[in-house]
Every structure is written in structure tokens, then in C-alpha cells.
């Protein structure tokens, strides 16, 4: 049986990504790409020009939608929105820096940082929660598009959760998988299951300002 190739990408930079100190940006922040983010998306589109995508999917968040539309370019494809790939719900910690979180929520933040895989963001989701809503959808797409290549534009925590599962990492270590804005991960889905071929490829945006 032929394999399915999945290009799993992160959206381009937003104003929140560029904030220093770093602030959390979950699923209740729905701003557009920054000027630098649009440049990153254009660089991603150039990289993907020759990739024969059969279908393209994205989170409903505006930053993912804009990145995906840029990546599709002139292809005669309709972008399909998948809520399963929406960014993690970070609850009460939205738009807060970690210093602010530790100061305002000392007990809850200590619990989260001690076990970031299963303890949820305060009032939100955990990495395990994200895996539960993304992995079944990803597998369904892999079997639906056997023998083809598909693209997915998602988010930092979403990508980390998916990749940690495929790499068979303990979920608490998902946070150690870096995902640059507009990075590319390539997953080959075989009859025996998924394999990661490329992880956080970002050479196409290295000449642009880097953010978290």
C-alpha cells in the first residue's frame, strides 16, 4: 500500500509571538500575521512550490488560515478548516508571560511545570487533551489520502503534541520539541503507522527575524 505524506507546519509570526518577554497565545487570541509573519509565509510558499499537494487543511485561527492560503498559492485547492487543529486553550494564562503566571498563579504554575503533559494550563487544556482531539483526525486524513501528499497548518502546542506521540516521547517532553514559526515537519504514514522524516525544518525563514 502506498504511503501518505503529511506536511505539518506552524503558522507564521504574529504580534504576540514577537512580544518580549514571551507571552502565551492560545485559542482565544485570533490576530493576523505580522509583517514579518507574512514574509515567513511567502518564504514557506516558495519552498513548497513544487510539492504536489492533494489537499490542504488548517486550524480555524486566522494566523493559520493566512499561512495556509499563502502556502497553497495558485494551486486549484480549497482550504479545508479543521477545528481539531486549533491551538491549545491556555485558559486564564492567555497573553501572560511566565513571570506573570508564576507570580499570579504560583501553585497552579508549579503543578503545570512539574508535569506539563497531563496537568492543563489553568482553566484550559493539557497536552494530552490536545493529543486526544488531534491524533484521531490526523490518522483519518492519512488513510483518506493514501498515496497522496497533504498539507496541514497548525500551531506550536498542537504540532508538539502530535510529534511527541509519533516519536513515542513521554508527553511531558513534548514541550522540548521546538517549532519555529512557519517551520515544516514531514510525516510519512505507512501501513505500519507514522514516521517522522523531517522535524522543524526552518532554513527557508532563517534569514528573517526569529521569534518563539
Task: Identify the meaning behind each predicted range.
Residues 58-59, 132, 153-154:
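Short beta-strand scaffold positions
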Residues 3-5, 42-110:
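Phosphate-coordination/substrate-recognition cap region in phosphate-metabolizing enzymes
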